[in-house]
Structures are given as structure tokens and as C-alpha cells.
Design a protein with these regions (language model features):
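Small-residue-enriched alpha-helical segments and adjacent helix-cap loops
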Residues: 1-132
């Protein structure tokens, strides 16, 4: 459901060039994964992310993963409720919540607001179907 500004995308590309091997991997849940950042440079990467209002908090490991929705959220003709604001509220609530930092396993949430469930909510740990 998320959007990345041009400045944020340029920063992500610069991180790949300056701190990794020139590329990054988009995960299934739309995280960007760098595999070769030297530990000694990790703080520099966090500073670069913070400069464009991004962070690395709970982006991997046993925590709540990116909250997903319909790929057509906001423009789907059968959409009754736009799920993106609900995803953002859940993200803000869970990101810094200490109870979600060390879950026994990665935890996945999806939100759908359309008649057709393109978010596959039944395959997630929590799948929310907004009223239609």
C-alpha cells in the first residue's frame, strides 16, 4: 500500500551504491533488502534513511512484517473502502510497540476493502476484510 517519493528512491539507490554491491532486493512484502552492508557502516545507512523519513525498525526478523493490501488499493473499481489508511494506522501502532519486536516468528497482516480479495487475507496471520 505504500508509496516511495523520488527523494526516498534516490536515497535507497545511493545506499545500494555506497554501502552495498550496487543493488538491492525487493522482498515479497515490498521491503528493500541489502545483503552486503558492512556492520561498521550500518549506522551510516540508518542516518541516510532517517534523512528521508525512513527507518530500519522491525524490517526483518521475528516481528510484524509489512502490512499488505490489494495491489489496486485506491483505484480498484470494486473497492468499497480504501484499505491504505487502515494499513498505515496499524503500521504506526505496531512499529514501535515493544510487544511486537520479538515475536516467536514473523507475523503477517493484510487488509482488503474490495469485493474481490486480491490481498489474500486468508493466507495471513491476521486478515482484515473491511465492511463492504
Amino acid at each position: 500500500y505504500g508509496a516511495v517519493s523520488a527523494a526516498q528512491m534516490r536515497t535507497l539507490a545511493k545506499i545500494a551504491t555506497d554501502f552495498d554491491r550496487g543493488y538491492a532486493h525487493f522482498t515479497t512484502r515490498q521491503n528493500l533488502q541489502y545483503n552486503w552492508i558492512p556492520l561498521a557502516r550500518a549506522a551510516d545507512v540508518m542516518d541516510a534513511l532517517a534523512a528521508v523519513d525512513m527507518h530500519g525498525i522491525q524490517t526483518s526478523g521475528n516481528c510484524i512484517r509489512n502490512i499488505t493490501s490489494d495491489a489496486y488499493a485506491g483505484v480498484a473499481p470494486d473497492e468499497i473502502v480504501d484499505p491504505r489508511p487502515y494499513c498505515e494506522i496499524l503500521r504506526q501502532w505496531s512499529t514501535l510497540h515493544p510487544e511486537f519486536a520479538f515475536l516467536p516468528r514473523k507475523f503477517k497482516i493484510a487488509v482488503s476493502g474490495a469485493k474481490e480479495d486480491r490481498a489474500a487475507i486468508g493466507w495471513h496471520d491476521i486478515g482484515l476484510q473491511l465492511p463492504i
